[in-house]
Amino acid sequence: MLTIQFLCPLPNGLHARPAWELKEQCSQWQSEITFINHRQNAKADAKSSLALIGTGTLFNDSCSLNISGSDEEQARRVLEEYIQVRFIDSDSVQPTLAELTAHPLPRSLSRLNPDLLYGNVLASGVGVGTLTLLQSDSLDSYRVIPASAQDSTLLEHSLATLAEQLNQQLRERDGESKTILSAHLSLIQDDEFAGNIRHLMAEQHQGLGAAIISNMEQICAKLSASASDYLRERVSDIRDISEQLLHITWPELKPRNNLVLEKPTILVAEDLTPSQFLSLDLKNLAGMILEKTGRTSHTLILARASAIPVLSGLPLDAIARYAGQPAVLDAQCGVLAINPNDAVSGYYQVAQTLADKRQKQQAQAAAQLAYSRDKKRIDIAANIGTALEAPGAFANGAEGVGLFRTEMLYMDRDSAPDEQEQFEAYQQVLLAAGDKPIIFRTMDIGGDKSIPYLNIPQEENPFLGYRAVRIYPEFAGLFRTQLRAILRAASFGNAQLMIPMVHSLDQILWVKGELQKAIVELKRDGLRHAETITLGIMVEVPSVCYIIDHFCDEVDFFSIGSNDMTQYLYAVDRNNPRVSPLYNPITPSFLRMLQQIVTAAHQRGKWVGICGELGGESRYLPLLLGLGLDELSMSSPRIPAVKSQLRQLDSEACRELARQACECRSAQEIEALLTAFTPEEDVRPLLALENIFVDQSFSNKEQAIQFLCGNLGVNGRTEHPFELEEDVWQREEIVTTGVGFGVAIPHTKSQWIRHSSISIARLVKPVDWQSEMGEVELVIMLTLGANEGMNHVKVFSQLARKLVNKNFRQSLFAAQDAQSILTLLETELTF
């Protein structure tokens, strides 16, 4: 017997998704494989995902796999690599509690005296609809169905039908839906799930209905006893597939409580299973209130992915009496507004207007090319492993794909993908990209990414071993097939080719020879293909740094693989806990190496990118910009924030920062430099067209202040519009800011304003400003930084003096548009 010992690396513990993947990895071997959680003293068949889930394994638990059988040597080698390298990728990090904290109730809402119920935010957003109560299903009618001689046949038929339905949904879905459906499919195909139902029928003489329910209750009891919130919340998945199985078996007995949404609806339920959520018409699902759903339930993951706001912590009996009434679910402030009056409805209409503006602006910003504040261009690309990830990456603002990991096509299967399968996968991502560049990294397999069907012997140091370009000559046919597939796909878009683990010029010369052979073959075969293709290499072996000049004669670009390069430069295995603290790319030696690569390549007209984890680290963006990199490729969710940060950076200041960092003596000195580095603020004028509005319709004073503060948030002049609004209201409560002549000047000095601003709204109809000076039809709001000194008094005084002038006031009221108001103020005022 052979053993693999490890600490569980999964942040959420061993739940359905990673359990299914581990089961799949173990099921390909003849050997018996037992999973042991030493903390729990729990053992499980590693070829059963349900058994694995039942071990209650949490993050950092001490675990082992015991392997015994004819292929135990090979199984241990492959499984050890999987546990060390890829097991953690089967889990996903959920939003933290801090990310889901509700905003304090804005004064512009609380002053309207809404009828509110307070809950906990599970998925952010705002939804308006009719409160609709969904009663939980009772399973009692299934439990009392008598046993029948046909029960075994019925069970097999129902399991097959449910599997067929799930497979059909898998073909129609993508993203989180597909992932969760895959987990459900794996559960019903698990031997333990069906086996225990059969056992309950045979040994305890239960009818099929009772056996399905008993099996569900037994599994749920194990999960409910877990110390992990995440594992406890998998109860909903077990209940979901069990209830689906019951309904398929006896559809005539009682239909599941599926709801048809014919109008905008706020759904109220004790809980909702993933399949129930997927059956809803999301166009009419305005929001959900779920009494028992936790922060990591699969239903909640689906809701977040679909931008459906969700609250919890509201007892059903407190809401039931409001069923059928209109409501607003505000999962930004964590409240449910019951039967809102006109003023409250008006508040949320303004909130929706601001949200629409923000969404439109974010979409436009993501679509813009990435530039620094002084217009230094840098490409921002995405790292992906499948064509399905491409649309999401482009939606996040990716200007291309800097790393397409083609090895994903070769993993977790019994044989290599053929040319046609690869061609279709590569073509799919190129068609999705349009004219955006896609860099296909040729298969980085072998070594640390063991592929059973290649039969490469086990190595002591797989990261330094027989992998990537090093195996291509032995598997020349496999490599040529991939080249042919990429060249064929390249005729449909902007494809580029990148070779991993290159360390010598001979390797790239051999690759270029194989590339020419593939082109000749495709011509001979009469297949559509690209005649030429841009060729680059991954710079991850330090030896390449010293002969960049020679490589510039043979390739078109370089992409630095910072993950492996860091390991090789320091001789550090980042998966070894004893030396992993030494793994740090932000050191003088690493930065000098990057500087050397970029300088040598640029001198010869070649571009340099980086595609490791470092490329998406916002803290180090000033250094990467300063070093002169042409491209940063990263996980696509990081792209919007990186683009936004880049626009605030001056490339010359960053270049000086990088120069100083390369002169440092230690990583600690570099970190201190970064901490002290303060990018110059993008100076914005006090008056700007984006903050001036004419012919605005507000019902009250609250809406005016809400809109003007919210608009500053949309325009990036504040990152805290709610807090800024509170400062405005605090000043307003000292003395109302109506100044007469139909004008109000709300104002504040605030730490929450990033760029001091004057905002103006000229109203269609005057509103009550709750001032002795009468109604207001022109609002001029001053929001000045807390460090402005007495400048706010100067600005306020100038405005007040001008407003006394009748001609000036008349000009403001008569101005045809926002530009005319801006021109008038710029002419008349001096700041």
UniProtKB/Swiss-Prot annotation:
Residues 119-650 are annotated as: PTS EI. Phosphoenolpyruvate binds at R405, R441, N563, D564, R574. It is found in: Cytoplasm. Its EC number is 2.7.3.9, 2.7.1.202. The keyword Lyase does not apply. PROSITE patterns: PEP_ENZYMES_2, PTS_EIIA_TYPE_2, PTS_HPR_DOM. Gene3D superfamilies: HPr-like, Mannitol-specific EII, Chain A, Phosphoenolpyruvate-binding domains, Phosphohistidine domain, PtsI, HPr-binding domain. It catalyses: L-histidyl-[protein] + phosphoenolpyruvate = N(pros)-phospho-L-histidyl-[protein] + pyruvate; D-fructose(out) + N(pros)-phospho-L-histidyl-[protein] = D-fructose 1-phosphate(in) + L-histidyl-[protein]. The modification Phosphohistidine is found at H15, H298, H747. Residues 685-828 form the PTS EIIA type-2 domain. Residues 1-90 form the HPr domain. Its main location: cytoplasm. It is an enzyme of class 2 (transferase). Mg(2+) binds at E540, D564. Keywords: Cytoplasm, Kinase, Magnesium, Metal-binding, Phosphoprotein, Phosphotransferase system, Sugar transport, Transferase, Transport. The active site is at H15, H298, C611, H747. InterPro entries: HPr-like, HPr-like_sf, PEP-util_enz_mobile_dom, PEP-utilizing_PTS_enzyme, PEP_util_C, PEP_util_CS, Phosphohistidine_dom_sf, PTrfase/Anion_transptr. Its cofactor is Mg(2+). Belongs to the PEP-utilizing enzyme family. The PTS EIIA type-2 domain is phosphorylated by phospho-HPr on a histidyl residue. Then, it transfers the phosphoryl group to the PTS EIIB type-2 domain. Multifunctional protein that includes general (non sugar-specific) and sugar-specific components of the phosphoenolpyruvate-dependent sugar phosphotransferase system (sugar PTS). This major carbohydrate active transport system catalyzes the phosphorylation of incoming sugar substrates concomitantly with their translocation across the cell membrane. The enzyme II FryABC PTS system is involved in fructose transport. NCBIfam families: fruA, PTS_I_fam. This is Multiphosphoryl transfer protein. It comes from Escherichia coli O6:H1 (strain CFT073 / ATCC 700928 / UPEC).
